[in-house]
Swiss-Prot record:
InterPro entries: Helicase_ATP-bd, Helicase_C-like, HIRAN, P-loop_NTPase, SNF2-like_sf, SNF2/RAD54-like_C, SNF2_N, SNF2_RAD54_helicase_TF. A zinc finger (RING-type) spans 832-880. Residues 92-104 have a biased composition (Basic and acidic residues). The keyword Transmembrane helix does not apply. Belongs to the SNF2/RAD54 helicase family. It comes from Eremothecium gossypii (strain ATCC 10895 / CBS 109.51 / FGSC 9923 / NRRL Y-1056). Residues 914-1072 form the Helicase C-terminal domain. It holds the Pfam family SNF2-rel_dom. This is DNA repair protein RAD5. The keyword Cell membrane does not apply. The lineage of its organism: Eukaryota, Fungi, Dikarya, Ascomycota, Saccharomycotina. GO terms for biological process: DNA repair.
Length: 1085
């Protein structure tokens, strides 16, 4: 290492390599040169000023006399700027940073000259062609250099050597002329990167070998990138001379200099060289295992100082392609990591708690809700409302989503590990640095996100009180106070009027009104919750639905006290938007689209996840100054679900589809899941808050204390009749699947096979469902074959008739019955001899034996089954007469009159029998219990309603049904009646999984029955969360009915697999169908 004078520092870089002039020949750094500020009339003075300004940008601060001399000598020349720069570097000294530069040691010239670039004069010539320099930079000279990492590669010899290479000998890396094949298609005419990057002997400059393709791709680009340097050292060649094709191990040390951190360095995103440079930087960081730090992290594992060549799996072989294929799917574990990263970035548990004033908000928030309220107020920049110090956790502001924070690794370069000492200008360099590998920018200062978005996504898990949390925000900030204060003394803005229509083209700003868009089923619940928390504080809510408001714009703009909240539904928004698309200008002057709201809140915001639907487009057209999305599932099917939410909030620049595709969609479709998720996590971190029931606060306490939840899977056995029907449809389904597999067209028969599966599921519930359609299955919509089924009575054969209807003694039995019970009065106070229940009710649930004794239907059937299992004769508990299944009667309401008819058990659903048995037990143990029964088949709910009404009298049990066929008023009445506690009656709510699976608060019930399973376990979890959520005070017990040895049992296994491995988040619809095909194969395996 060469020494300078006493007290001088050793230097590391050559003078010609430290100065990185502009390179117009590269599209990487093209920017538009700007002249001096202000207008100058004298053309000569303007040219001189421009010449000196651009000269300073390349050379830094110089004395005025030197600059004047360069202008006098070269100002009039066409390429004068190039000549002035060349003259300066050939014979002049610069000031400032050059002083430190001249102190650097030049003895290590060869070791630092591992990058073979073109001569400075040639670079300057290319940079100045056509006029002005193309880089703007305050400092051109390297002021410091830091070690970034090391990697080891297996190089392949391309030239023989006369003697072995010495251990530790230095190698040069040379980039030869020519262009590699960037398309990925290797050919003889277009060789790869490894043909253009070679190792050379540092002493003789003789070529020795080539590098692996992936390493060559990195070096080919970065060798000509200012601020990145490499040093190559030979560390293994088996102590023999090299022949062509031999492998030898080379260590690459990578360094970065201050030039890489020059803010003027990055070029334009559309430039090919710029994109290649950024890709090379990404590959370099990946190869060096540079792992980003989470905000607030201090340490990362340091790399070992010594390497074991035999165990180091990071060595890249020149003969093997190193990139590996990514998995073809993403699972729920990755989504959980995504949510976890957003929770960490929000620093939610470090925020102070904000409590709404008790005179304004009637409820007491939980601790995590108070912290969430602070986060929401910060998102809306309502700092004046917050207590001092509330924003300390986010004082510095969130880091820009595209940037990552890294810690400088410990210097384990070859020279340092061998004890070589040197002095470097690193004293003032922070121990962390920041990189945006997508744009190629580097910084030593934390880049702060500068989004102007006011709002965010509250994605708390279902049941944690998102509704109450957002209502607390509305109570705290009901209006735009700053706007109201500034406009109090001003006249309202007058828009331009259309001469033809007389309609203002400027939307008035409703600074005191928040619009909340909800699913129709949740409209009554939101209204009730608003009244409950804001009772008596002066705020009021207006429901905008079914034309109840004649002119919304007048209501919001011209009234002195407009509503604080307007509640409407997605359907209303879509309807009004559709009218606007038909050029109905009156609608734009009256409805939701005629004003700009203060705030818009979307409940169940995932309803707009498909941006191509009318609902999504309509919601996007609404305008406001603050926007919020409430959803427990921001990602449902695809990663692009998030784009619609971001677009709704106008989150720049991510709301632009081209930007989103470049950084999210395209990498995802190319199976680069890690890159796509990395960007998503960074983007969503500042604007998304998610808490789950299992999370704990800063003190280690659970966020919410909920009572226990017990889920019981009850296996149901088919009756003989159901088993016969199931076997018939199963054989048809298996035959269809086997044929499709044999022909290889299973995907083409997708809908037909799903139809077979649907029929099997329907038989498991009730054979009367055959011919109806699953309202949740999008794949079977409008399918013509849905009603193409054989006659059920034909399939049942003799079982379709009552066993006793054709018996010779049945007419006599009916006559004897009518004699014993001549009228309805004789049927009063009937008692079951098995359960000793007096006054069996309703009478339609009574079954009479041949001897004329009455019994509860469920009691008698259980008794017969019990005796059959024992192999004993079934006899009447009263008179000991034989009981035969073919001689049973029941009462049926015919035209308002009860008539005896032969009883048949063949038309009974085993699941319904089990449900009735459980309900009767609940009635006996807790007469006023409230129960929810879930199913995804609306027609099944109809069957259940009829069966339950026949089994339970109205004076002891009330049955309610809630599905998509009810209008808003009917839904409100059903929920109000069900939630009202009765002291003597049991209440049963039959609930459609689609209509009531989300949003509803049914904590009044503590028992639930899920009658049929669904493909996704998440659907059933949502149903359970309607009951097991905040407000529940009792232990929750949930029964899931599964028919054993049926398709339902296999669906249960698929659910278990999804829970353990995760559900697919597919890139497109075709992949979603393929994943369903895999499930189909499992069902018929």
């Amino acid at each position: 290492m060469q020494r300078t004078g006493d007290g001088e520092r050793p230097r590391f870089f050559q003078q010609d390599l430290d100065v990185i002039p502009d390179d117009k020949g590269s599209d990487l750094f093209i920017q538009t040169a700007e002249g001096p500020d202000g207008h100058v009339d004298d053309e000569v003075i303007e040219d001189k000023t421009r010449f000196i300004t651009n000269l300073k940008e390349v050379l830094g601060a110089l004395p005025d006399d030197i600059l004047e001399g360069y202008w006098n000598s070269y100002g009039a020349s066409k390429d004068g700027l190039s000549k002035a720069i060349q003259q300066h570097f050939e014979g002049k000294e610069t000031k400032g940073c050059s002083d430190a530069h001249d102190d650097l040691n030049t003895e290590t010239q060869n070791s630092q000259n591992t990058i073979v670039n073109g001569h400075v004069s040639n670079q300057i010539k290319r940079a100045s062609e056509g006029g002005l320099p193309i880089l703007k930079r305050k400092k051109q000279l390297c002021c410091w250099r830091r070690f970034l990492g090391s990697t080891q590669v297996n190089a392949m010899a391309t030239r023989p050597t006369a003697q072995p290479l010495k251990y530790g000998s230095e190698l040069l890396i040379r980039r030869t002329s020519g262009q590699p094949n960037n398309s990925g298609l290797r050919s003889r005419k277009k060789p790869g990167f490894s043909q253009y990057v070679r190792f050379c002997d540092a002493t003789s400059s003789r070529e020795l070998g080539r590098l692996p393709e992936d390493i060559s791709e990195i070096l080919h680009t970065l060798l000509q990138t200012p601020g990145v340097e490499f040093k190559a050292t030979m560390i293994f060649c088996n102590s023999k001379r090299l022949s062509v094709g031999d492998l030898f191990v080379v260590r690459l040390d990578c360094f970065v200099t201050s030039l890489l951190f020059d803010p003027a360095l990055p070029g334009k995103a559309e430039d090919e060289q710029f994109q290649q440079r950024n890709r090379a930087l990404m590959l370099l960081f990946k190869n060096l295992n540079m792992t980003p730090l989470a905000e607030g992290a201090d340490l990362v594992p340091e790399k070992p100082e010594f390497y074991d060549l035999e165990e180091d799996e990071s060595i890249t072989d020149a003969t093997v392609n190193s990139p590996t294929a990514s998995d073809d799917y993403m699972d729920l574990n990755q989504l959980r990591n995504f949510y976890r990263s957003t929770q960490e970035s929000a620093s939610i548990f470090k925020l102070r708690e904000t409590t709404p004033p008790v005179d304004k908000f009637q409820l007491e928030l939980r601790r995590y809700q108070k912290q969430g309220l602070t986060w929401m107020l910060l998102r809306e920049r309502e700092h004046a409302i917050l207590e001092p110090g509330s924003q300390d956790a986010l004082a510095d502001g969130p880091m820009d989503p595209m940037w990552r924070m890294f810690k400088w690794p410990r210097d384990t370069s070859w020279d340092v590990s061998r004890g070589t000492t040197y002095v470097s200008l690193e004293a003032d360099i922070p121990d962390k640095f920041y990189a945006n590998l997508h744009t190629g920018e580097f910084s030593l200062v934390k880049p702060i996100s500068k989004s102007i978005l006011k709002g965010g996504i509250l994605a708390d898990e279902m049941g944690l009180g998102k509704t109450i949390s957002i209502l607390a925000l509305i109570t705290m900030v009901p209006s735009d106070t700053k706007h109201l204060l500034t406009t109090a003394q001003e006249k309202p803005p007058v828009g331009h009027l259309s001469l033809e229509l007389g309609i203002s083209t400027v939307k008035p700003y409703t600074a005191s009104t928040t619009l909340i868009v909800v699913p129709m089923s949740l409209l009554p619940q939101w209204r009730n919750e608003f009244v409950r928390v804001n009772d008596g504080n002066g705020l009021y809510c207006e429901v905008y639905y079914a034309g109840n408001v004649s002119n919304l714009r007048t209501l919001l703009v011209k009234q002195k006290s407009p509503p604080s909240v307007v509640l409407t539904t997605y359907g209303v928004v879509q309807t009004e938007w559709s009218k606007l698309q038909q050029f109905d200008y009156e609608a734009s002057n009256e409805g939701l689209f005629s004003v700009e709201f203060f705030r818009i809140i979307l409940d169940e915001g995932h309803n707009i996840r498909n941006r191509t639907t009318k609902t999504s487009k309509a919601v996007m057209a609404l305008t406001s100054r603050r926007k919020w999305v409430l959803t427990g599932t921001p990602i449902m099917n695809r990663l692009d679900d998030l784009f619609s939410l971001i677009k709704f909030m106008n989150f720049e620049p991510w709301c632009k589809i081209d930007y989103w595709r470049q950084f999210v969609s395209d990498p995802f479709e190319k199976k680069d899941y890690s890159s796509a998720l990395e960007v998503i996590q960074a983007v969503m971190g500042p604007i998304l808050l998610r808490r789950t029931k299992n999370m704990k606060d800063e003190d280690g306490n659970p966020l919410v204390q909920l009572p226990p939840k017990e889920v019981v899977i009850e296996m149901i056995r088919f009756s003989d009749t159901e088993a016969g029907l199931y076997k018939y449809f199963l054989s048809k389904a298996e035959h269809s699947v086997k044929e499709s597999l044999a022909r290889g067209d299973l995907l083409k028969k997708y809908s037909t096979i799903l139809l077979h599966i649907l029929r099997l599921r329907q038989v498991c519930c009730h054979f009367k469902l055959l011919g109806s359609q699953d309202e949740n299955d999008e794949d079977l919509k409008n399918m013509k074959l849905i009603n193409d089924i054989p006659d059920i009575s034909t399939l049942l054969g003799e079982d379709s008739q009552s066993p006793g209807s054709s018996s010779e003694g049945m007419p006599d039995f009916i006559e004897d019955f009518k004699t014993k019970y001549p009228n309805s009065d004789a049927l009063k106070d009937l008692e079951c001899s098995i359960c000793t229940c007096e006054a069996i009710s309703p009478l339609t649930s009574v079954v009479f034996t041949r001897c004329g004794h009455p019994f509860c239907e469920s009691c008698l059937l259980e008794y017969i089954q019990f005796q059959n299992k024992k192999g004993s004769e079934t006899i009447c508990p009263n008179c000991r007469a034989a009981v035969e299944s073919r001689y049973l009667l029941k009462l049926e309401d015919i035209n308002g009159k009860l008539e005896p008819v032969p009883y048949s058990n063949t038309k009974k659903s085993s699941k319904i029998v089990a449900l009735i048995r459980h309900l009767k037990h609940l009635q006996d143990t807790s007469a006023n219990e409230q129960v929810v029964v879930f199913s995804q088949f609306s027609s099944y709910l109809d069957i259940l309603e009829n069966e339950l009404r026949q089994s339970f009298a109205s004076d002891i049990c009330e049955i309610y049904k809630f599905d998509g066929r009810l209008d808003l008023k009917e839904r409100s009445n059903v929920l109000a009646k069900f939630t009202e506690k009765s002291l003597v009656k049991m209440k049963v709510l039959l609930l459609s999984l689609k209509a009531g699976g989300v949003g509803l608060n049914l904590t009044c019930a503590s028992h639930a029955f899920i009658m049929d399973p669904w493909w996704s376990p998440g659907m059933e979890d949502q149903a359970m969360d309607r009951i097991h959520r905040i407000g529940q005070s009792n232990t929750v017990k949930i029964y899931r009915f599964i028919v054993e040895n049926s398709i339902e049992e296999k669906m249960l296994r698929i659910q278990e697999k999804k829970r353990s491995l995760g559900e697919f988040v597919d890139a497109d619809e075709e992949e979603r169908r393929r994943s369903r095909i895999e499930e189909i194969k499992m069902l018929f395996a």
